[in-house]
Amino acid sequence: MALRAILSVLLLAHLSVTTPTPKHKKEKPAAFFLAGDSTTAVQSAGGGGWGNGFLATLQPPAYGVNKGHNGATTVSFVKGGDWATVLNLVKNATDAYNVFVTIQFGHNDQKPANNVSIAQFKTNLASLASDVQELGATPLLFTSLSRRNFNGAQLIQDLGDVVNATREVAAASHIKLIDLNAASRTYVQAIGSAEADKYNLVAGDRTHLNAHGSDVFGRIVADLILKSDKSLSRWIGRNATLSHLIAEGVYA
């Protein structure tokens, strides 16, 4: 009887070690909804940014929607109804997708004519991020895409106020920061003014991106997001050649 009891204990111990753990439910694919100004938006006569270039890196069934709006501020994006559209996209996707909302503003908020103070800008960013979290999605706060204006050989930093404000909001609210300004500045400084001008939407426009520029800076965004969350590698495709050129500071 004692031997039988011992064998029973050993058998149970063996089963506890060898019985496979039940598999987790199937991982949800990612969905990215992009909120921002013309430096995120689809290429058009009035603007164009990194958004479509980034969305092109997504691997189905992952998908995204670019809701960047030319001329938008953190105020006008809400008042004009764009933010409500983004939130509706989130609501309709959260059951089937792991939803991320990119939030990048600043280019227009910093313009005096738009009457958005830095304090208000920070409050607005925090509010947008909170709205996303309340719906069970993940906000990604982006610092602004760099402009490509040079003084001689030196790239000008003319977005410092809104960039620093965005970093402060991310830190204070414990929201993931994607420091696109730092990454885009590093790359643009490395390739220089003449090469950077090849990304201009039209001659002399050193703010917006043409289609090729969207692909290159969209790749920068993809790599930054992958660095911040390696679990997304299933849904964001890689381009080793392009990523290497960017990392080396070589025009791509």
Predicted regions and their residues:
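Extracellular/periplasmic catalytic domains that process cell-envelope and extracellular macromolecules
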Residues: 25-28, 58-59, 93-97, 134, ...
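Alpha-helical scaffolding segments of alpha/beta enzyme cores, especially the outer helices
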Residues: 120-130, 134, 161-168
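Extracytoplasmic/secreted cell-surface and envelope-processing proteins
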Residues: 42-45, 74-77, 109-114, 118, ...
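Catalytic His-Asp segment of secreted/periplasmic serine-dependent ester chemistry enzymes
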Residues: 145-252
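Fungal secretory targeting signals
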Residues: 1-22
